[in-house]
Amino acid sequence: MADSAPRLAALDDSIVSRLPSYSQSLFAAKTAHELSFSAIAEHLGRSEVAVAALFYGQATASPEDITKLAELLSLPEAQLRKDLGTGFPDRGRSGPMPPVEPLIYRLYEVVQNYGYAFKSVINEKFGDGIMSAICFDTKVEKETVEGADWVVITLRGKWLPFTRF
């Protein structure tokens, strides 16, 4: 009979050297408590992608996030506050470019294959500008269509028109 325990995302050893040292502690506690990013997100009142980004050092934790993480993961709050509450995220350096991890590469491939198509359609709808990745949110959902599972990724960014100067 198959094991019914949930499968949880763990830290990939091949990227540990590119991540903040606290990432290992967060992932170890997540595994020890058998928590999914979804469960942690519910406790923090944030999206699961935002929580995963915290674990990888790609997002900023609020003081409330730190308190709730310390409580949920049984980690010393003072240490978490020191690790997560000071400095700024070092975004964009957690993996090689182009990506070598297959799922991450597929996302990269989507941009390679459809980037200019997305840009053209967006420009026609909004004009000359960019979609913010700062004033931004995202979510991942699972959808089943005719018995097949589909990944639905929503990217929602504020429109920033280029200004004339």
Swiss-Prot record:
Supply one GO BP term. cyanate metabolic process
Q: Which SMART domains match?
A: Cyanate_lyase
Query: What Enzyme Commission number does this protein have?
Result: 4.2.1.104
Q: Which UniProt keywords apply?
A: Lyase
Q: Which reaction does it catalyse?
A: cyanate + hydrogencarbonate + 3 H(+) = NH4(+) + 2 CO2
A Gene Ontology molecular function term for this protein is: DNA binding
Could you name the active-site residues? 106, 109, 132
- Please give the InterPro entries that the UniProt record associates with this protein: Cyanase, Cyanate_lyase_C, Cyanate_lyase_C_sf, Lambda_DNA-bd_dom_sf
- Pfam families linked to this entry: Cyanate_lyase
Could you tell me which PANTHER family the record lists for this protein?
CYANATE HYDRATASE (PTHR34186:SF2)
Q: What does this protein do?
A: Catalyzes the reaction of cyanate with bicarbonate to produce ammonia and carbon dioxide.
Q: Which family does it belong to?
A: Belongs to the cyanase family.
What protein name does the entry list? Cyanate hydratase
Q: List the top taxonomic levels of the source.
A: Eukaryota, Fungi, Dikarya, Ascomycota, Pezizomycotina
